[in-house]
Amino acid sequence: MQLLLLSFALSMDSAALNMANGARYKSLGFGKILFIAFMLGFFQFLMPLLGYFLGISFAKFISSIDHFIAFFILCFLGFKMLKEACSSEVGESLSMDIKTIFVGAFATSIDALAVGVTLSFEAVSIFESALIIGIVCFALSLAAFYIGKFMGEILEKKALFLGGAILIFLGFKILITHLLEEGVL
């Protein structure tokens, strides 16, 4: 359940971006829509793997504070998403050439890199976790394009707000769980 919530939260940037694309490019063909959703999902799959292996490389040095690191990273990302959701500016949509599709997929998956670092402190199967994150992102991004096509850019901010709230919740859950395990609370 926690992994699905995390996957949903990480997918909100990609879904919001693709929702804006749906509002902007209403006549885009299904193949292009599928490709964009695939790239968004692929980067959400790839970045936690990279973050995980970066985290493992220095985990022995910070294992006593890993829960604080996870808490601060998730809360920072969550508050960043909340700030974006409350901003009066609507994010830039991708143009539809291959270069900007890659840039958009990379930019919306940077949060997943940081989450991959936090997952290196947990007893998880990183490949399975990253695969679920990528699949959820793909599905949500695909659906988001069509929602954007019909509902417009107004929903973009609500998706960012929900994703930010979920990341903050997960950060607090990790912190409280570890503090309870250590007998601090």
Swiss-Prot record:
One of its GO terms (cellular component) is plasma membrane. Belongs to the MntP (TC 9.B.29) family. GO terms for molecular function: manganese ion transmembrane transporter activity. This is Putative manganese efflux pump MntP. The chain crosses the membrane at residues 33-53, 61-81, 101-121, 126-146, 160-180. The keyword Membrane applies. It is found in: Cell inner membrane. Keywords: Cell inner membrane, Cell membrane, Ion transport, Manganese, Membrane, Transmembrane, Transmembrane helix, Transport. PANTHER family: MANGANESE EFFLUX PUMP MNTP-RELATED. It comes from Campylobacter concisus (strain 13826). Signal peptide: none annotated. Probably functions as a manganese efflux pump. It is a multi-pass membrane protein.
